[in-house]
Swiss-Prot record:
Result of altering E14K: No spontaneous pyroptosis-inducing activity
Effect of A348T: In Rim3 mutant; gain-of-function mutation; causes an alopecia phenotype. Attenuates intramolecular interaction between the N- and C-terminal domains, hence may relieve autoinhibition; constitutively active in triggering pyroptosis
Protein name: Gasdermin-A3
TM region(s), chain numbering: 78-95, 99-120, 164-180, 184-198
Gene Ontology molecular-function annotations: wide pore channel activity
Any single GO BP term: sebaceous gland cell differentiation
One Pfam family in the UniProt entry: Gasdermin_C
UniProt keyword terms in alphabetical order: Cell membrane, Coiled coil, Cytoplasm, Developmental protein, Lipoprotein, Membrane, Mitochondrion, Necrosis, Palmitate, Transmembrane, Transmembrane beta strand
């Protein structure tokens, strides 16, 4: 995983481990996630591993009629982090407007990340709503309305106070040492020294709220939203004699891009959600599933390429274009539902580290995905609602079928998602802050297990 992404995710874990603060994934996009910036949510977002947003080139102020702008933003405080990528934290000392985190190893001792939070003051937002309406003929606004896209406004941003060079030395992701990985050809990818310079004012994390657009160019950014709310709600018919406000002349319908899993965040809901998406993938022809597995196998371990594929599918769906998978004897045309399902699983896979993606390739080759899936599923099923850390016994038969090499791969795969498996016992250490990581791993394993199982069956039939 890129150092910048390591930093932003670690920052969110420290500041807001179970809240709605979203880490920024791309350093190059930081200027487009400042307060008042407009962003779009990815098509297949889910609460189970967090919603993700993509930049636009506009701010809310760009869409409003000319007028005065808020003079400043509210500064919610300053925070200082030392050795932030360390896995184990020795102590946490709080003083007014300052938080210092001391760790054990990982970053160079000179690296201290100082951040501040900037947010839109409620009073400034209310004044803006009263004084400036939306510009009715703005091309971007009309384009989003035509495509029925939901727009979100960045309401709070965490930014770097000073330029800092963050150096990651050794393995800052794993929660235990894995010297045996060198024998598996993975040690180089896990222990590279990397560094990134974060400029002053760089946004590292942010919070968003939904923009609502009404008749007569009125707008709002409600504090509380539900999954049926849209930026451009449909207008309902009312009697001519009736007096009704612009905000009442709407008919809310569930949005197509709603946040999956928004109502009940438990393992049963996650499992049902994953099953719905795998059922759509199962509808592909045997050749289509085999082709999808081949394509993913080539991309696993190349996170940038996976993200590029995700953007390609998103763009095709937005433009109503058809997408095909390259396969023999002929290409396979993907339906809209199939593309939606593939986007869901791509979202899960891109949450994993590059190291995990490479381990998945090895696991595919060794045909141990069913064991790994069962391990993650069993752990989530037992602990999903567990809010306290703890060490719990592991069913001995879960890993009994694995040899030494397969066991090392499995320990590394789940360990990089924050689940520490201890052979003595056997037992595992549960940390509720890693739940989202394990949910993404569960979804990714579910897809690859389905595709490899179907592919093996196809191969067997062909040989029979």
């Amino acid at each position: 995983m890129p150092v910048f992404e390591d930093v932003t995710r670690a920052l969110v874990r420290e500041l807001n481990p179970r809240g709605d603060l979203t880490p920024l994934d791309s350093l190059i996009d930081f200027k487009h996630f400042r307060p008042f910036c407009l962003v779009l949510r990815k098509r297949k977002s889910t609460l189970f591993w967090g919603a993700r947003y993509v930049r636009t080139d506009y701010t809310l102020l760009d869409l409003l009629e000319p007028g005065s702008s808020p003079s400043d933003l509210t500064d919610s405080g300053n925070f200082s982090f030392k050795n932030m990528l360390d896995v184990q934290v020795q102590g946490l000392v709080e003083v007014p407007k300052t938080v210092k985190v001391k760790g054990t190893a990982g970053l160079s001792q000179s690296s201290t990340l100082e951040v501040q939070t900037l947010s839109v003051a409620p009073s400034a937002l209310e004044n803006l709503k009263k004084e400036r309406k939306l510009s009715a003929d703005h091309s971007f606004l009309n384009e989003m309305r035509y495509h029925e896209k939901n727009l979100y406004v960045v309401m709070e941003a965490v930014e770097a106070k000073q330029e800092v060079t963050v150096e990651q030395t050794g393995n800052a992701n794993a929660i235990f040492s894995l010297p045996s990985l060198a024998l598996l050809g993975l040690q180089g990818s896990l222990n590279n020294n990397k560094a990134v310079t974060i400029p002053k004012g760089c946004v590292l994390a942010y919070r968003v709220r939904l923009l609502r657009v009404f008749l007569f160019n009125l707008w709002d950014i409600p504090y509380i939203c539900n999954d049926s709310m849209q930026t451009f709600p449909k207008i309902r018919r009312v009697p001519c004699s009736a007096f009704i406000s612009p905000t009442q002349m709407i008919s809310e319908e569930p949005e197509e891009e709603k946040l999956i899993g928004e109502m009940h965040e438990d393992f049963k809901t996650l499992k049902e959600e994953v099953q719905r998406e795998t059922q759509e993938v199962e509808k592909l022809s045997p050749v289509g599933r085999s082709s999808l597995l081949t394509s993913l196998s080539h991309l696993l371990g190349k996170k940038k390429e996976l993200q590029d594929l995700e953007q390609k599918l998103e763009g095709a769906l937005d433009k109503g274009q058809k997408v095909t998978l390259e396969a023999l004897p002929k290409d396979v045309l993907l339906s809209k539902d199939a593309m939606d399902a593939i986007l869901y699983f791509l979202g899960a896979l891109t949450e994993l580290t590059e190291e995990q993606l490479k381990i998945l390739v090895k696991s595919l080759e060794k045909k141990i995905l069913p064991v790994q899936l069962k391990l993650v599923e069993s752990t989530l099923e037992q602990n999903f609602l567990q809010d306290k850390e703890g060490v719990f016994p592991l069913q001995p038969d879960l890993l009994s079928s694995l040899g030494e090499e397969e066991l090392t791969l499995t320990e590394a795969l789940v360990g990089l998602s924050g689940l520490e498996v201890q052979r003595s016992g056997p037992q595992y250490a549960w940390d509720p802050d890693t739940r989202h990581n394990l949910c993404a791993l569960y979804a990714g394993l579910s897809l690859l297990h389905l595709l490899s199982r179907k592919s093996n069956a196809l191969t067997y039939c062909a040989l029979s």
